[in-house]
């Protein structure tokens, strides 16, 4: 994502990738 504000989907997708 670009910029400070992200959607919940972007946030979740990033963490899902980290912890998978």
From Swiss-Prot:
Keywords: Heme, Iron, Membrane, Metal-binding, Mitochondrion, Mitochondrion inner membrane
Bilayer topology: Peripheral membrane protein
Pathways involved: Energy metabolism; oxidative phosphorylation
Subcellular location: Mitochondrion inner membrane
GO biological process per UniProt: oxidative phosphorylation
Record flagged with keyword Metal-binding: yes
Lineage top rank: taxon: Eukaryota
GO-annotated cellular components: mitochondrial inner membrane
Sample GO molecular function, one term: metal ion binding
Annotated function: Component of the cytochrome c oxidase, the last enzyme in the mitochondrial electron transport chain which drives oxidative phosphorylation. The respiratory chain contains 3 multisubunit complexes succinate dehydrogenase (complex II, CII), ubiquinol-cytochrome c oxidoreductase (cytochrome b-c1 complex, complex III, CIII) and cytochrome c oxidase (complex IV, CIV), that cooperate to transfer electrons derived from NADH and succinate to molecular oxygen, creating an electrochemical gradient over the inner membrane that drives transmembrane transport and the ATP synthase.
Family from the record: Belongs to the cytochrome c oxidase subunit 5A family.
Subunit structure: Component of the cytochrome c oxidase (complex IV, CIV), a multisubunit enzyme composed of 14 subunits. The complex is composed of a catalytic core of 3 subunits MT-CO1, MT-CO2 and MT-CO3, encoded in the mitochondrial DNA, and 11 supernumerary subunits COX4I, COX5A, COX5B, COX6A, COX6B, COX6C, COX7A, COX7B, COX7C, COX8 and NDUFA4, which are encoded in the nuclear genome.
Name by which UniProt lists this protein: Cytochrome c oxidase subunit 5A-1, mitochondrial
Species in which this protein is naturally found: Thunnus obesus
């Amino acid at each position: 994502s670009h910029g400070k504000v992200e959607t919940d989907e972007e946030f979740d997708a990033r963490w899902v990738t980290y912890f998978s």
